[in-house]
């Protein structure tokens, strides 16, 4: 599909399942092997050689960020600490997905004091009451242990995000989220639609209606406005369902990155997929390498897996379409993906104009790399694909503390394009205006 997505030569981010062990048995879990007690992979522990191979592959392919997941990463502490040390020494930024039920004071102290961990931990919170949480995890006492883990992280200054995976089993209790947030401090709230796992494809509990999806968006919008925390969803919201983009502008900024800028690595077996929910394997990091697998998943970047309802939609390049895994599993979809939907959008407040007297402070928390189309710039959580000329402009000012338009005129003629490029760098928070 022409123009569907940028064609990165390698991913900028990866999810790495560092173990197959998990102390929960969530009914929505995408890991098909976790119900197979005979699967010997559950018992395997990563070797130092495997850790070295993964680290070298990420460095060689210029991967910026790795999210450590599982299984439950806190169930393999020695491996977890080795990976944090190895990746950190190579400048790879880290995130972690954990249910936090195994978090202790000792672990939190080790993370912060020995490994200087200050990145967000995204924890799965399957229910907002003990009854529902324990029902979803199928483990008695899981809710109390998760909440205890959240509070321990707060005690040691570790930022926590919560991800609530929603099906019809726990949809009705979302209103309890407000009370939960009044008692427990978090930095991020995600509400994610459950995807029917491979072993339970036809379970109607996983198929949400259009009104239920809109209700999720309304809850997130209220959380952002009331508590001032960042909000989002692991699976994207189709714009033709939300319709009012202006109302939900804080949750529609991210479309699916699987196979476009991100992929998933099973560190135990080495298998590489585009998405953690996907059954297909595109390569193996130990035998054929990351680059080979990335090249093999071209169909994700070409838009070949986009569902038919989204392919001809004029908003596809902005929306990204429905989650590929949901679109591929919901044979009884309860909502209508409508390419002719009336999308309502009021642009963000305009940025102040730039003139020759305008000065900016330059962020030094920027990663960038060149690509055939230009390059990728990342500042904080903003990752943008830009032209070669913007890369050149950034390289000219990247080591400076403060710049003005006159600094840009050293390499560019004054033009509308230059001023627009400066504004783009400001939107990415690479430049911050000095008033």
Spans of features found by a protein language model:
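Long, charge-rich, low-complexity alpha-helical segments
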Residues: 12, 383-435
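Short, ordered coil/turn segments that flank beta-strands lining enzyme active or ligand-binding pockets
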Residues: 267-268, 380, 427
């Amino acid at each position: 599909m022409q123009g569907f997505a940028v064609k990165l030569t390698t991913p900028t981010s990866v999810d790495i399942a560092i173990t197959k062990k998990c102390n929960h048995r969530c009914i929505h879990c995408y890991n098909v092997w976790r119900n197979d007690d005979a699967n010997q992979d559950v018992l395997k522990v990563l070797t130092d050689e495997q850790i070295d191979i993964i680290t070298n592959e990420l460095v060689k392919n210029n991967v910026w960020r790795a999210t450590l997941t599982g299984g439950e990463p806190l169930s393999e502490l020695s491996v977890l600490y080795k990976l944090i040390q190895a990746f950190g020494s190579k400048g790879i930024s880290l995130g972690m997905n954990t249910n936090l039920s195994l978090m202790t004071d000792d672990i939190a102290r080790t993370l912060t004091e020995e490994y200087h961990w200050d990145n967000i931990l995204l924890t799965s919170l399957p229910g907002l009451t003990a009854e529902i949480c324990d029902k979803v995890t199928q483990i008695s006492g899981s809710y109390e242990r998760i909440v205890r883990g959240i509070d321990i992280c707060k005690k040691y200054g570790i930022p926590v995000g919560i991800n609530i995976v929603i099906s019809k089993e726990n949809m009705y209790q979302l209103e309890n989220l407000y009370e939960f947030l009044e008692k427990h401090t978090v930095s991020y709230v995600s509400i994610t639609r459950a995807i029917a796992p491979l072993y339970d494809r036809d379970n109607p509990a996983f198929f949400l209606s259009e009104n239920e999806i809109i209700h999720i968006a309304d809850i997130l919008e209220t959380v952002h406005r009331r508590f001032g925390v960042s909000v989002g969803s692991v699976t994207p919201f189709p714009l033709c369902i939300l319709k009012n983009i202006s109302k939900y502008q804080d949750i529609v900024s991210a479309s699916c990155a699987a196979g476009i800028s991100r992929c998933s690595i099973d560190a135990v077996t080495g298998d590489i997929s585009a998405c953690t929910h996907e059954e297909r394997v595109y390569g193996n990091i130990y035998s054929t390498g990351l680059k080979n697998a990335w090249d093999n998943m071209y169909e994700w970047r070409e838009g070949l897996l986009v569902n038919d309802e989204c392919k001809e939609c004029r908003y596809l390049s902005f929306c990204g379409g429905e989650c590929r895994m949901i679109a591929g599993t919901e044979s009884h979809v309860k909502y209508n993906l409508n390419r002719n939907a009336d999308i309502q959008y009021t642009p963000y407040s305009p940025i102040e104009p730039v003139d020759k007297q305008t000065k900016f402070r330059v962020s030094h928390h920027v990663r960038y790399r060149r690509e055939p189309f230009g390059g990728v710039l990342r500042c904080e959580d903003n990752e943008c694909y830009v032209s070669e000329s913007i890369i050149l402009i950034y390289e000219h000012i990247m080591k400076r503390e403060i710049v003005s338009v006159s600094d840009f005129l050293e390499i560019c003629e004054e033009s509308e394009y230059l001023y627009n490029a400066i504004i783009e760098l400001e939107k990415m928070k690479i430049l911050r205006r000095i008033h």
